[in-house]
């Protein structure tokens, strides 16, 4: 961030520099505070709620599970009930619960490597293990990532066919978050899976957000999951649970997963709050996801129209028509200035248009993620355009302050 942008957002003189870490921490606190006090928002995730609000989620638990049963111990009881529920939804023989997705996928791919005899995992350069897990595949589980492509889309059949070395597993992140929550077409997906089979590799889906992929594919969850040998799903992203994940697949694989789960420290004494919140999410949020996806497309179009009407040089929605209820928004401005404008706009209007951080993919560029949930369903296209106009007005003021500080 430039010195002027740092000082402009605080009203300080250019010589009074604020450390980046401190500035970002302060901005995050303000953004979360603005989210909690906002009267209107496109989506409010669990991580932005208070402890009291999060605990209230369990008030619905009696609707999905018998609360007079004994609490779970080391993976039985309500945890097993959740595993059975997930296996049924995905059309697999069994499923294993894990406290984190990072652990879940390492264990799954480690078990597949033991069966195939090949620790190489073919994946996208933007896949979650490559971007957000501190090289856990190689550092912890002795797996060897092999990057298929770095293009902002899923790997193609030709790219998988053309890999110049054997691999034991092909991991496909559906949707691919860091490319804009993108999905392939159904035909492209089936072709890639077929090529992996030709190369005698197993197919594993990183389906952290697979729940909201049914609209794009126009297929039910079990038909999508049927393409893969194993599928990982998350309970706290789309479903708004407290945390946790599961891997579904053949029963013999799942039995082995549970043995390795124990070795990795993932067989926790009691997990009933997390398991119950996941069951509530499957009951409450899962049926709503198609509506969120369809409305995200309305929001995306209105964002483009709003920025064009406000005189912004360009604004890009990635992908142009969202594949899920989440997508990226790109703007041609300094990311730190945009981030400050977004928080100030929310603080001043109590309308939270942008609930997530802004990143700088390059000089003079800003990108954020848009997440449309239940709260966003009440927004019309005109509501979105009006909020954009207000935001751009605040952004222009921030740019002026930036220019004054740099002068």
Task: Show the residue positions of the predicted features.
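Conserved C-terminal alpha-helix-loop-beta "cap" of PLP-dependent enzymes
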Residues: 2, 11-25, 310-406
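Conserved N-terminal alpha-helix of the aminotransferase class I/II PLP-enzyme fold
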Residues: 24, 30-100, 114, 125-131, ...
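PLP-dependent aminotransferase-like
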Residues: 113-169
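Hydrophobic beta-strand scaffold residues
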Residues: 144-145, 203-204, 353
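Active-site phosphate-binding strand-loop segment of PLP-dependent enzymes
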Residues: 153-208, 212
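Distinct, well-ordered alpha-helical segments
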Residues: 160, 214-222, 339
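Active-site C-terminal subdomain of aminotransferase-like
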Residues: 178, 183, 226-333, 403-407
């Amino acid at each position: 961030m430039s010195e002027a942008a740092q000082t402009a957002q605080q009203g300080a003189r250019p010589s009074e520099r604020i450390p980046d870490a401190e500035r970002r921490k302060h901005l995050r606190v303000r953004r979360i505070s603005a989210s909690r006090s906002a009267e209107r928002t496109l989506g409010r995730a669990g991580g932005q709620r208070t402890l009291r609000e999060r605990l209230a989620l369990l008030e619905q638990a009696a609707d999905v599970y018998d609360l007079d049963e004994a609490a779970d111990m080391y993976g039985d009881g309500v945890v097993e009930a959740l595993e059975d529920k997930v296996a049924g939804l995905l059309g697999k023989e069994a499923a294993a619960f894990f406290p984190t997705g990072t652990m879940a996928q390492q264990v799954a791919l480690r078990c597949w490597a033991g069966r195939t005899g090949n620790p190489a995992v073919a994946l996208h350069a933007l896949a979650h293990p490559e971007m957000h897990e501190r090289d856990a595949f190689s550092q912890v589980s002795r797996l060897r990532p092999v990057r298929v492509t770095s293009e902002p889309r899923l790997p193609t059949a030709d790219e998988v066919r053309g890999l110049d070395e054997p691999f034991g597993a092909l991991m496909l992140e559906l949707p691919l978050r860091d490319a804009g929550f993108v999905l392939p077409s159904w035909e492209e997906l089936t072709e890639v899976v077929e090529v992996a089979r030709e190369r005698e590799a197993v197919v594993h889906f990183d389906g952290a957000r697979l729940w909201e992929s049914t609209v794009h594919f126009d297929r039910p969850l079990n038909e999508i999951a049927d393409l893969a040998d194993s599928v990982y799903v998350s309970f706290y992203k789309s479903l708004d649970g407290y945390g946790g994940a599961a891997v579904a697949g053949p029963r013999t694989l799942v039995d082995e997963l549970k043995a390795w789960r124990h070795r990795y420290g993932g067989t926790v004494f009691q997990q009933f709050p997390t398991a119950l919140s996941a069951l509530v999410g499957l009951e409450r949020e899962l049926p709503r996801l198609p509506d969120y996806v369809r409305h995200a497309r309305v929001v995306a179009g209105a964002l483009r129209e709003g920025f064009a009407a406000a005189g912004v040089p360009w604004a890009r929605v990635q992908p142009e028509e969202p594949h899920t209820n989440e997508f990226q928004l790109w703007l041609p401005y300094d990311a730190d200035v945009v981030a400050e404008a977004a928080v100030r706009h929310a603080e001043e209007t109590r309308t939270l248009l942008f609930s997530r951080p802004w990143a700088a993919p390059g000089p003079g560029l800003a990108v954020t993620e848009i997440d449309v949930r239940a709260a966003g369903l009440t927004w019309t296209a005109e509501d979105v355009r009006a909020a954009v106009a207000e935001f751009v007005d605040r952004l222009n003021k921030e740019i002026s302050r930036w220019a004054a500080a740099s002068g």
